[in-house]
């Protein structure tokens, strides 16, 4: 029996991980966020109500589940409290079942101002960040100057350290970026009231998880972003500032690899990307319009239109290897309904040398042309279908081809936005390792 399951994105984020986490967590005891911050955007549709979570684990919509924001996550206490209050409007109360690692770095106003100032300075070369301070917060962590959640428990020490960090940031903001300074006193004034609201949630979450594992509890590890936004394995420098691949689970929670039983890779039936960076299968035609309209392809965090393209199996296969995936979940299959033909990119070709490239260096991407296989589409609606056998033959053929190319099984298929629009090909809790 698989007790501990990792759910991560195989593309550039926005794969639909939140819904999958929500569906699987109903049978679990814990759900854990292990990297990223409130730059993530997990959209859930429950009883026709849309709920968007940026920081709190998606599985907390189930009232029997305990949520963990682990040490690999950078936390804005203001955004956290905002989400807690938003959930309360849906009669979901998490105060007594959400725990935050005392080691999680804080995101504060100076991180946001630095993020904005840098993007402005870069101009047309900007990376397209969310402007929420994620990168600068991770920089502080690596430079060993970060304020962490645990620091909120000592107001005197917090005040002293905060003033030093603000002085450090203001020197750069004013002198180099010609940006407005931040006010240490205002940051402290705004921060202090948040402490009482989250004080009891601050814990040694690694110990909580170790105890849960020893007690044979089921744990879902919820990834944010996608594999090709990973700081090490993504399309650098157009990446996020954390490890969104499998390594982020281990370092971001303190749970060792032997305790991970099954790794589920979530991929859309096509491809999308928000912001700048390489995207070999990108479309600019009527199919792009079809994906955007039918798939509602606008970022849940930024509101930006997502770039769309055909499924990139070259990238997907690389993600399978990097993450040691056990199986796949294909989402938004219903968005392909009504297309005359469907394509899968199976290789990259350098347009100058005609050489087949496995995975390009950053300077090579601009010379890459996708090589496609083409398959017939289908007219029958797949929206809401719950059994594999009920899918159109062409849709099943498409799924089979993805399995052949990636050499791992497709265990889950999402056929619509609601939590009930899903096909469980296999029960991943009971697949033998």
From Swiss-Prot:
IMP binds at residues 14-17, 39-42, 130, 144, 225, 240, 304. Mg(2+) binds at residues 14, 41. Its cofactor is Mg(2+). GTP binds at residues 13-19, 41-43, 306, 332-334, 414-416. GO terms for cellular component: cytoplasm. Pathway: Purine metabolism; AMP biosynthesis via de novo pathway; AMP from IMP: step 1/2. Keywords: Cytoplasm, GTP-binding, Ligase, Magnesium, Metal-binding, Nucleotide-binding, Purine biosynthesis. Substrate binds at residues 300-306. It is found in: Cytoplasm. One of its GO terms (molecular function) is GTP binding. The keyword Cytoplasm applies. InterPro entries: Adenylosuccin_syn_GTP-bd, Adenylosuccin_syn_Lys_AS, Adenylosuccinate_synth_dom1, Adenylosuccinate_synth_dom2, Adenylosuccinate_synth_dom3, Adenylosuccinate_synthetase, P-loop_NTPase. Transmembrane segments: none annotated. Binds 1 Mg(2+) ion per subunit. Its main location: cytoplasm. PROSITE patterns: ADENYLOSUCCIN_SYN_1, ADENYLOSUCCIN_SYN_2. The active site is at 14 (proton acceptor), 42 (proton donor). It comes from the Bacteria. GO terms for biological process: 'de novo' AMP biosynthetic process; IMP metabolic process. It holds the Pfam family Adenylsucc_synt. It catalyses: IMP + L-aspartate + GTP = N(6)-(1,2-dicarboxyethyl)-AMP + GDP + phosphate + 2 H(+). Plays an important role in the de novo pathway of purine nucleotide biosynthesis. Catalyzes the first committed step in the biosynthesis of AMP from IMP. Homodimer. PANTHER family: ADENYLOSUCCINATE SYNTHETASE. Belongs to the adenylosuccinate synthetase family. This is Adenylosuccinate synthetase. It comes from Buchnera aphidicola subsp. Acyrthosiphon pisum (strain Tuc7).
């Amino acid at each position: 029996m698989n007790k501990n399951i990792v759910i991560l994105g195989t593309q550039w984020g926005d794969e639909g991980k939140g819904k999958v986490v929500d569906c699987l967590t109903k049978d679990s005891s814990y759900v854990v966020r292990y990297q990223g911050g409130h730059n993530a955007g997990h959209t859930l549709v429950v009883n026709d109500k849309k709920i968007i979570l940026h920081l709190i684990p998606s599985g907390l919509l189930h009232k029997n589940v305990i949520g963990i924001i682990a040490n690999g996550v950078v936390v804005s206490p203001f955004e956290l409290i905002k989400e807690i209050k938003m959930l309360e409007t849906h009669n979901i109360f998490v105060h007594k079942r959400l725990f935050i690692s005392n080691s999680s770095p804080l995101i504060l106003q100076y991180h946001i101002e630095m993020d904005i100032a840098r993007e402005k300075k870069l101009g047309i070369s900007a990376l397209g960040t969310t402007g929420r301070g994620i990168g600068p917060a991770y920089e502080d962590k690596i430079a060993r100057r970060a304020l962490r959640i645990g620091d909120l428990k000592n107001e005197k020490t917090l005040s002293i350290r905060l003033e030093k960090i603000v002085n450090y940031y203001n020197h750069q903001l004013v002198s180099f970026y010609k940006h407005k300074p931040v006010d240490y006193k205002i940051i402290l004034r705004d921060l202090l009231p948040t402490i009482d609201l989250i004080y009891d949630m601050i814990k040694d979450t690694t110990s909580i998880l170790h105890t849960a594992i020893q007690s044979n509890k089921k744990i879902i590890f919820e990834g944010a972003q996608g594999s090709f936004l990973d700081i090490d394995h993504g399309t650098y420098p157009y990446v996020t500032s954390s490890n969104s691949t499998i390594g982020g689970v281990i370092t971001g929670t303190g749970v060792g690899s032997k305790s991970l039983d099954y790794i589920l890779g979530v991929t859309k039936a096509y491809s999308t990307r928000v912001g700048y960076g390489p995207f070999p299968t990108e479309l600019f035609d009527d199919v792009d319009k079809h994906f955007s309209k039918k798939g509602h392809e606008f970022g849940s965090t930024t509101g930006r239109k997502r770039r769309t393209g055909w499924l990139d199996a070259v990238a997907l296969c690389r993600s399978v290897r990097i993450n040691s995936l056990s199986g796949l979940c294909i989402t938004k299959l219903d968005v392909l309904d009504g297309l005359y033909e469907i394509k899968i990119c199976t290789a990259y070709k350098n347009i100058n040398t005609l050489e087949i490239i496995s995975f390009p260096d950053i300077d090579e991407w601009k010379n890459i042309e996708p090589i496609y296989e083409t398959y017939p589409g289908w007219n029958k609606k797949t929206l809401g279908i719950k059994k594999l056998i009920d899918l159109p033959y062409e849709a099943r053929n498409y799924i089979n081809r993805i399995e052949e190319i990636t050499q791992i099984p497709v265990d889950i298929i999402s056929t619509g936005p609601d939590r009930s629009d899903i096909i469980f090909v296999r029960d991943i809790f009971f697949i033998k390792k």
